[in-house]
């Protein structure tokens, strides 16, 4: 009887642990969104990425209000987990809670918008190694926490847009 009870408890724990893991992974996916940009540069020492991304025409007009190195909040147009183009740019106020899930703070690298692309910087020290094969001018896929107010933690990952095929 005691062995049966132990066996039932072990099975219950295994099933429960598997369910918890699946919930954690899906919750993480639901709390992030992905967007694509052109890699300009990576400062390996600081983990700072400089990227160009597309802006909607109305948002592009607003960039002239800012100067290089200003902290701004970019808000992406998007649905579910996918950001398309930047739809809004605003001054970053670290005391204000971000309510839009597709917004995160960055540093404006240049107030010049060329062909509806804006250049900005963000920190993602843990992602530097994953883009060693990416050259400036190539595209990256960036996963960002929804509504993150902390620029160090906003970006979850940066990966090559075209991942090399694995040999498995």
Annotated model-derived regions:
Residues 2-7, 12-168:
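Short, flexible, surface-exposed loop segments at domain boundaries
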């Amino acid at each position: 009887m005691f062995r049966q009870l132990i066996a039932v408890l072990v099975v219950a724990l295994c099933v429960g642990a598997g369910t918890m893991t699946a919930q954690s992974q899906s919750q993480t996916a639901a709390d992030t969104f992905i967007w694509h940009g052109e890699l300009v540069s990576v400062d390996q020492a600081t983990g700072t990425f400089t990227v160009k991304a597309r802006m909607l025409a109305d948002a592009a007009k607003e960039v002239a209000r800012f100067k290089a190195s200003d902290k701004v909040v970019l808000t992406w147009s998007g649905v579910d987990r996918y950001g398309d183009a930047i739809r809004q740019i605003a001054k970053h106020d670290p005391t204000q809670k971000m309510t839009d899930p597709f917004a995160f703070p960055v540093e404006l690298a240049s107030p010049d918008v060329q062909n509806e692309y804006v250049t900005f910087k963000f920190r993602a020290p843990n992602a530097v190694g994953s883009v060693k094969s990416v050259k400036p001018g190539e595209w990256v896929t960036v996963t960002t926490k929804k509504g993150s107010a902390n620029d160090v933690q906003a970006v979850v990952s940066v990966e090559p847009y075209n991942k090399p095929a694995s040999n498995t």
